[in-house]
Amino acid sequence: MREIVQIQAGQCGNQIGSKFWEVISEEHGIQSDGFHAGGEDEHLKRLQLERINVYYNEARDGKYVPRSVLVDLEPGTVDTIKASPYGKLFRPDNFIHGQSGAGNNWAKGHYTEGVELVESVLDVVRRETEGCDCLQGFQVTHSIGGGTGSGLGTLLISKIREEFPDRMMCTFSVVPSPKVSLTVVEPYNATLSVHQLVENADEVMCIDNEALHDICFRTLKLTQPNYGDLNHLISSVMSGITCCLRFPGQLNSDLRKLAVNLIPFPRLHFFLVGFAPLTAKGASSYNRITVPELTQQMFDAKNMMAASDPHNGKYLTASALFRGKIFTKEVDEQMHNIQTKNSSYFVEWIPHNIKSSICDIPPKGTPMAVTFIGNNTAIQDLFKRISIHFQAMFRRKAFLHWYTLEGMEELEFTEAESNMNDLVYEYQQYSNQETEEDGGEYQEEHEEHEEQAEN
């Protein structure tokens, strides 16, 4: 089987990671004790178990154990997961935690506290990979604004890349939001992380809390969304992206096929993700939804999980992962229509740049759904925003001593910043022919912010 090992790093990574396991366990009929629920329907049972080895290891007693490594630099989140209803699902040895925490400091996660823990994490990762017949790759859940998910998360990614250079590395990265800021040093942590992700990851699914909040307010009409609601949205996307890997389907996919179809140039592997139809936690969508409606919704900026409007850029490539009893012909027609009617939103030099796949098994609570992955040049907005905040602080050397005390040098910050700015420039270059104009605008915007910061 084509196995995938998941690594959850930091508080955010562990929370969205454990929610993902809850969702897919339910889809595969795995109970919280790890045993299959059984049932009368032999056909359903066969579908649920046929490719379950991708994410689960079957123990001798018939228990299914997630191929997951749970890492944090403090015990709090890991202990909460152990005590949760699904805590007994995981292998106890796969919980690894330090005592001191990273204190929202990337350098602590990457250089000091993280280094002490990294070898024991890699031992567990090696043990998990040895239990695989044919390892497909790794899936990492983390945030890039804190200390552990960003610092230790990127350290693990680079170490795993060294040891398994030919396996896929896919990350679900929660990016700092412009409005929902949790700590003042987020721009530093995020810039240093993006620098690592450009070099060492194959696919990065960008998610941010502001976009998730907007979905909860506008679409789901939740007045006070909590992290449970946000994690529900993230887990819907994760379940959708991975369903073709976990279930037998008409058009199956794997991490490498996804990458080959979505990444025209190796550095441009940062994706916008979306989901339709959007439903609140615990709610079900009983309205009969059609494939044309799903297609329209999935390209809507309101359904995107990152605060970046795809209409500000162009699609280099996109992938639509449909779920439910859907005819291939209908999907192909819709994809063709979208590209014909909205040709201005797609680059001309990649023909037929939407890939689609279909998985027969719908998610819980709705008869059909679609998950969307787009390689859109508008993703540069995320990086520009981080860069502007980074520059405002770095010019004053604000908060820098927290990083230099851990042994970092200023040069690392400069390198990370220029790598991220290069990435923005590359996205601009491929977005249209008027590259100079775009570049000029970005330069002016930067100079404007520099002047504001200096005044």
Curated annotation (Swiss-Prot):
This protein's UniProt keywords: Cytoplasm, Cytoskeleton, GTP-binding, Magnesium, Metal-binding, Microtubule, Nucleotide-binding
Residues binding Mg(2+), per UniProt: E74
Residues the entry annotates as binding GTP: Q11, E74, S143, G147, T148, G149, N209, N231
CDD domains in alphabetical order: beta_tubulin (cd02187)
Pfam families, sorted: Tubulin (PF00091), Tubulin_C (PF03953)
Region (Disordered): 426-455
Compositionally biased region (Acidic residues): 434-455
Stored InterPro entries: Beta-tubulin_BS, Beta_tubulin, Tub_FtsZ_C, Tubulin, Tubulin/FtsZ-like_C, Tubulin/FtsZ_2-layer-sand-dom, Tubulin/FtsZ_GTPase_sf, Tubulin_C
GO cellular component, one term: cytoplasm
Quaternary structure annotation from Swiss-Prot or TrEMBL: Dimer of alpha and beta chains. A typical microtubule is a hollow water-filled tube with an outer diameter of 25 nm and an inner diameter of 15 nM. Alpha-beta heterodimers associate head-to-tail to form protofilaments running lengthwise along the microtubule wall with the beta-tubulin subunit facing the microtubule plus end conferring a structural polarity. Microtubules usually have 13 protofilaments but different protofilament numbers can be found in some organisms and specialized cells.
Record's subcellular location: Cytoplasm, Cytoskeleton
Keyword field contains Cytoplasm: yes
Annotated GO MF terms: GTP binding; GTPase activity; metal ion binding; structural constituent of cytoskeleton
Protein's name according to its UniProt entry: Tubulin beta chain
GO terms classed as biological process: microtubule cytoskeleton organization; mitotic cell cycle; response to bacterium
